[in-house]
């Protein structure tokens, strides 16, 4: 007997089977015989103990599990014949045993299906795509960063200022007790880089070489070591060295030395930096819009998620996590010791993140379906070429290592964001949005611009270290 049932609250198709009792009995007997062959009794050669005598030594649970494992492929195939296209099944099933004894087996397969989603009015979001207006101060800041990156650091004997690179020792205390990971010696820090928790670097300003001082901070609520979150801490610090930056001089000769195509004078550099800043502002606006728009939509929609999909996503996140630890040569035990996490804490985090990622992926998919957003072959090939250029691999290598489906999803998701921007942007950004919708015209001459901008960004990154 076969029974189908759609479970909208968990986005699953349940197919319940009552197995043929004769077949199940045959598989059970085969499992008994296989398990009996492992039994050793005095007076019998191994594997030659009669089944009647071996039964007393068998683990019934092991017999049932083996019988089910042998029968399962046939049962799953039988269940699959009862799936139709309109069910929108998107993954292989998990199964539950309803009833199982020597003579009877009832089993249900739970197939993940595309969930029922009722989206809010995503064409009229409160979140708006807005691009920050470029000011003269922005251009001056870009120039200053570039000059500082090309400058040099010299040791000075004066109190610490914003922008200095200091070498210092520190030791942290919570409730007047030292804590793991709270101590360091000869640590280099760029003041103003916000590398430490809020309030730490600001209190270093004004300190002098070889003098000790206490700094008081509160760990943030989302601090990676959760046992320290929201805790007040005191750091005893000692400044060893102070270096200040002497920026390069802005001259036409300096500009020419940057070797940026068609940029040889100060005025040309300013125009170039203005274009660079505009592009950075657009990308930053896209990132902010995507995050806030998805949050707004997500708060107004429930997306049922099948257990199988959640488990698969947790497995993927776990694989990435362990791969990252391996690359950084950090044993799991050491990581747990440093962060004060348990393996259950990590699993719980993965579960929350998995549900969030799956929910967002279905929101993307539903909007793409409603708006008819389908990647073209040209878009696919262009995306592969960009990935190849970015990673330094050949187009063939990218095609072989990154799945077609993964690339299609990436392209579709970007088309969804572009469509949401088209629906939800401020009037002042109309021209830029229109360009973006016309094959991303804002990326004209992109290859040369990317090369030039990468030089600037690398210089600015050096300045921030």
Curated annotation (Swiss-Prot):
Q: Give the E.C. number(s).
A: 5.2.1.8
Q: Where is this region: Disordered?
A: 431-465
Where is the protein situated, by its record's location annotation?
A: Cytoplasm
Q: The organism sits in which domain of life?
A: Bacteria
Q: Which GO terms describe its cellular component?
A: cytoplasm
User: What catalytic reaction does the record list?
Assistant: [protein]-peptidylproline (omega=180) = [protein]-peptidylproline (omega=0)
Q: Which SUPFAM superfamilies match?
A: FKBP-like (SSF54534), Triger factor/SurA peptide-binding domain-like (SSF109998), Trigger factor ribosome-binding domain (SSF102735)
User: Short name of one Pfam family for this protein?
Assistant: Trigger_C
Gene Ontology MF annotations: peptidyl-prolyl cis-trans isomerase activity
Keyword terms, alphabetized: Cell cycle, Cell division, Chaperone, Cytoplasm, Isomerase, Rotamase
Q: Which cysteine pairs are covalently linked by disulfides here?
A: none
Q: What is known of its domains?
A: Consists of 3 domains; the N-terminus binds the ribosome, the middle domain has PPIase activity, while the C-terminus has intrinsic chaperone activity on its own.
NCBIfam families reported in the protein's UniProt record: tig
Under what name is this protein listed? Trigger factor
Report the source organism: Mesomycoplasma hyopneumoniae (strain J / ATCC 25934 / NCTC 10110) (Mycoplasma hyopneumoniae)
Q: Which gene encodes it?
A: tig
């Amino acid at each position: 007997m076969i029974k189908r049932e759609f479970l909208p609250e968990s986005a699953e198709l349940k197919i319940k089977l009552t197995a043929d009792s004769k077949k199940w009995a045959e598989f059970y007997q085969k499992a008994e015989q296989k398990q009996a062959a492992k039994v050793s009794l005095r007076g019998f050669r191994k594997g030659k103990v009669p089944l009647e005598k071996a039964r007393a030594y068998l683990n019934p649970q092991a017999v049932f599990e083996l019988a089910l494992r042998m029968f399962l492929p046939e049962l799953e195939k039988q269940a699959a014949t009862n799936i139709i296209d309109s069910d929108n099944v998107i993954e292989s099933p998990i199964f539950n045993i309803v009833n199982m004894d020597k003579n009877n087996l009832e089993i249900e397969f739970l197939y993940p299906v595309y969930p029922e989603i009722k989206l809010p009015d995503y064409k009229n979001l409160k979140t708006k795509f807005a691009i920050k207006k470029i000011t003269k101060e922005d251009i001056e800041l870009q120039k200053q960063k570039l000059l500082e990156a090309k400058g040099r650091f010299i040791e000075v004997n004066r109190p610490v200022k914003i922008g200095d690179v200091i070498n210092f020792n520190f030791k942290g205390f919570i409730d007047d007790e030292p804590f793991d990971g709270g101590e360091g010696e000869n640590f280099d820090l760029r003041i103003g880089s916000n590398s430490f928790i809020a309030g730490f670097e600001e209190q270093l300003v004004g300190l002098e070489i070889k003098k000790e001082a206490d700094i008081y901070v509160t760990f943030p609520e989302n601090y990676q070591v959760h046992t320290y979150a929201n805790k007040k801490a005191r750091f005893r610090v000692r400044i060893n060295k102070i270096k200040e930056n002497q920026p390069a001089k802005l001259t036409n000769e300096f500009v020419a030395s940057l070797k940026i195509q068609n940029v040889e004078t100060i005025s040309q550099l300013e125009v170039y930096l203005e274009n660079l800043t505009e592009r950075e502002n657009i990308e930053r606006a896209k990132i902010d819009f995507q995050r806030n728009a998805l949050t707004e939509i997500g708060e107004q929609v429930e997306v049922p998620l099948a257990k199988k999909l959640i488990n698969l996503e947790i497995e993927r996140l776990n694989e990435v996590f362990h791969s990252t630890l391996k690359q950084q040569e950090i044993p799991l035990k050491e990581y747990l010791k440093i962060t004060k996490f348990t393996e259950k804490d990590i699993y719980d985090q993965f579960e929350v993140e998995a549900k969030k990622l799956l929910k967002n992926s279905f929101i993307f998919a539903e909007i793409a379906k409603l708006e008819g957003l389908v990647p073209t072959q040209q878009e696919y090939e262009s995306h592969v070429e960009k990935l190849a250029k970015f990673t330094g691999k050949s187009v063939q290598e990218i095609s072989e290592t990154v799945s077609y489906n993964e690339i299609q999803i990436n392209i579709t998701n970007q088309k969804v964001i572009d469509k949401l921007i088209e629906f939800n942007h401020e009037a002042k950004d109309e021209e830029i949005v229109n360009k973006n919708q016309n094959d991303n015209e804002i990326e004209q001459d992109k290859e040369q611009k990317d090369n030039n901008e990468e030089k600037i960004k690398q210089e600015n990154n050096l300045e921030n270290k």
